[in-house]
Amino acid sequence: MGIKSFKPTSPGRRQMTVLTFEEVTKDKPEKSLVVTLTKTGGRNVYGRITVRHRGGGHKRKYRIIDFKRDKDGIPGKVAAIEYDPNRTAYIALIHYLDGEKRYIIAPYGLKVGDIIESGENVDIKVGNALPLRNIPVGTIIHNIELIPGKGGQLVRAAGTAAQLMAKEGDYVQVRMPSGEIRLIKADCRATIGQVSNLDHENVKIGKAGRSRWLGIRPTVRGSAMNPVDHPHGGGEGKAPIGHPGPLTPWGKPALGYKTRKKGKASDKFIIRRRK
């Protein structure tokens, strides 16, 4: 794992850094575990933009990831660590003893040839998956379920990790990467270890074109728009905002405004809010 920088042969190269991909051992994905991915350009079924700044980018094939980790009692061998264009973490190709192949999110430190397992009472070892009630307090975990059997939904991005803080009856306390401490059902599964690709946060994009390769379109300032497009738009020359404070494109306060819905059902599971 490392970061590669370049000589300033052009303005775009001057600040650019890329990952060295030292952990990646295979360049072509397993054919049986990929499906075609249709681009949406951030539009919904009616053709309206629902997510701004999306569109273009390199073609991708979706890798089918096993988030459930429900193959109990059958050990699997790590056959390869691969790059996945659909996520920031690396993925690991697992060959199970019964012949099945699956992809999982690769934890930091997992290597080709390692044996991983999932089940009720497997060893507390990087890459193993088991219910939260059987994981010791203080253990670093990732790929955490919110509903038993649904598959991991939390802590899946590159370099992230959560920590099991305490156990209270049918629930356990987990400290999330954001600092939030929340209750999760003890029957939910999690995987031991931290997510791979720790250096992802240190990569500098370097130039606008590289964002376009990733399918990210430019973010235009509201003050550069027309009044019909943004509350900050319009005016002659560089006009002030014209409001007591900055607003979102939909007219809501942009600063200091709590966007979480009040009285949400999951509020009772949050012991301490993120900072």
Curated annotation (Swiss-Prot):
Keywords: Ribonucleoprotein, Ribosomal protein, RNA-binding, rRNA-binding. Residues 264-275 have a biased composition (Basic and acidic residues). GO terms for biological process: cytoplasmic translation. It comes from the Bacteria. The keyword rRNA-binding applies. GO terms for cellular component: large ribosomal subunit. The keyword DNA damage does not apply. GO terms for molecular function: rRNA binding; structural constituent of ribosome; transferase activity. InterPro entries: NA-bd_OB-fold (IPR012340), Rib_uL2_dom2 (IPR014722), Ribosomal_uL2 (IPR002171), Ribosomal_uL2_bac/org-type (IPR005880), Ribosomal_uL2_C (IPR022669), Ribosomal_uL2_CS (IPR022671), Ribosomal_uL2_dom3 (IPR014726), Ribosomal_uL2_RNA-bd_dom (IPR022666). Disulfide bonds: none annotated. One of the primary rRNA binding proteins. Required for association of the 30S and 50S subunits to form the 70S ribosome, for tRNA binding and peptide bond formation. It has been suggested to have peptidyltransferase activity; this is somewhat controversial. Makes several contacts with the 16S rRNA in the 70S ribosome. HAMAP family: Ribosomal_uL2_B (MF_01320_B). PANTHER family: LARGE RIBOSOMAL SUBUNIT PROTEIN UL2M (PTHR13691:SF5), RIBOSOMAL PROTEIN L2 (PTHR13691). Belongs to the universal ribosomal protein uL2 family. Part of the 50S ribosomal subunit. Forms a bridge to the 30S subunit in the 70S ribosome. This is Large ribosomal subunit protein uL2. It comes from Thermoanaerobacter pseudethanolicus (strain ATCC 33223 / 39E) (Clostridium thermohydrosulfuricum).
